[in-house]
Amino acid sequence: MAFDLAARLAERRAADLYRQRPLLESPQGPEVVVDGQRLLAFCSNDYLGLANHPEVISAWQAGAERWGVGGGASHLVVGHSTPHHQVEEALAELTGRPRALLFSTGYMANLGAITALVGQGDTVLQDRLNHASLLDGGLLSGARFNRYLHNDSASLASRLDKAVGNTLVVTDGVFSMDGDLADLPALADVARGRGAWLMVDDAHGLGTLGAQGGGIVEHFGLGVADVPVLIGTLGKACGTAGAFVAGSEDLIEALVQFARPYIYTTSQPPALACATLKSLELLRRETWRREHLAALIRQFREGAQQIGLQLMDSPTPIQPIVIGDSAQALRLSRMLRERGLLVTAIRPPTVPAGSARLRVTLSAAHSEAQVQLLLNALAECYPQLENADA
């Protein structure tokens, strides 16, 4: 029987769920050129405005001159260069952990950590709103896999009572589509009380949370005993690319031995690691970036409340505006684009059915005036959706 791909694609179009790739024709930044149109963007994860920072660019260029442009081999053959090792040491210091291990992508870090730690006869428990890479890792591990209610430590506790073997509890730190924080103190307490390990994917918290930018674990004042497995990505607040796992000496050595996505892939370009070293330096040194970002978040939330927008409970740069209907979310996104603003509509299956939204993301590179432009446009466009539904 032939694959009927055309029917699957037609079904997705009919449900207003068809995805398309905008063509970015400029560097990352608040002002971009997309599909030939100059726009003010509020949809990038470049939270600290480092993706196009001149010092980071210069570090990449110098790294390419010194180390070339290719990793050449896997880390376990001859691909683990000095810059890679230096980044791992810097990440261990930033997160307050003995060791860190560099991965090429966040997806690979999550799959590698979960599948190396649990397997048949074990249990993995995950928040129902976790990122797809975490859910895929749980399914691929072969362990008993179950999901607890979102951010609900009581729901987790009831599932832990039925767990078998080594048990890994997995949660996002900042939930990427809602922007809310995992209740790590409560989750860690429940996990430790039942002998389970807690793994946190802090993709959206690293750099934006904590006094030093160490992320959600620093934000809550927790340590390795509370969160034995910490994941972070480098393509968001750090502005470069890649990911890492941070934890104990034994954890990192176990991943080197058993994490297949780490073992069986070519290392990232050493010059990229040089750029990341510079971005980590800026992340820690230029604390004004987090301070300015926090001020923009307050400005947006106060302005959105005055307009009557339905926001999530988010203290982070991720500020979703819940619309509900996918077609209406697309319509609002189009109206904003007609006014020179780029805000992406997020639809199922990325978010639950009936919860389509505009995912506004703020950056330290934005100005207060630019955020006000967005609020003004939303004040003009959002009531038109309400009128259309009346």
Swiss-Prot record:
Binding site for pyridoxal 5'-phosphate: 106-107, 176, 204, 233
Pathway(s): Cofactor biosynthesis; biotin biosynthesis
EC number from the UniProt entry: 2.3.1.47
InterPro entries: Aminotransferase_I/II_large (IPR004839), AON_synthase_class-II (IPR050087), AONS_Archaea/Proteobacteria (IPR004723), AONS_Proteobacteria (IPR022834), PyrdxlP-dep_Trfase (IPR015424), PyrdxlP-dep_Trfase_major (IPR015421), PyrdxlP-dep_Trfase_small (IPR015422)
CDD domains: KBL_like
Keywords assigned: Biotin biosynthesis, Pyridoxal phosphate, Transferase
Modified positions (N6-(pyridoxal phosphate)lysine) in chain numbering: 236
Co-factor(s): pyridoxal 5'-phosphate
Superkingdom of this protein's organism: Bacteria
GO BP of this protein: biotin biosynthetic process
Presence of the UniProt keyword Transferase in the record: yes
Positions bound to substrate: 19, 131, 350
Reaction equation(s) it catalyzes: 6-carboxyhexanoyl-[ACP] + L-alanine + H(+) = (8S)-8-amino-7-oxononanoate + holo-[ACP] + CO2
Gene Ontology MF, one: pyridoxal phosphate binding
Subunit structure: Homodimer.
Annotated function: Catalyzes the decarboxylative condensation of pimeloyl-[acyl-carrier protein] and L-alanine to produce 8-amino-7-oxononanoate (AON), [acyl-carrier protein], and carbon dioxide.
UniProt xrefs under NCBIfam families: bioF
Family under the similarity heading: Belongs to the class-II pyridoxal-phosphate-dependent aminotransferase family. BioF subfamily.
Stated name of the protein: 8-amino-7-oxononanoate synthase
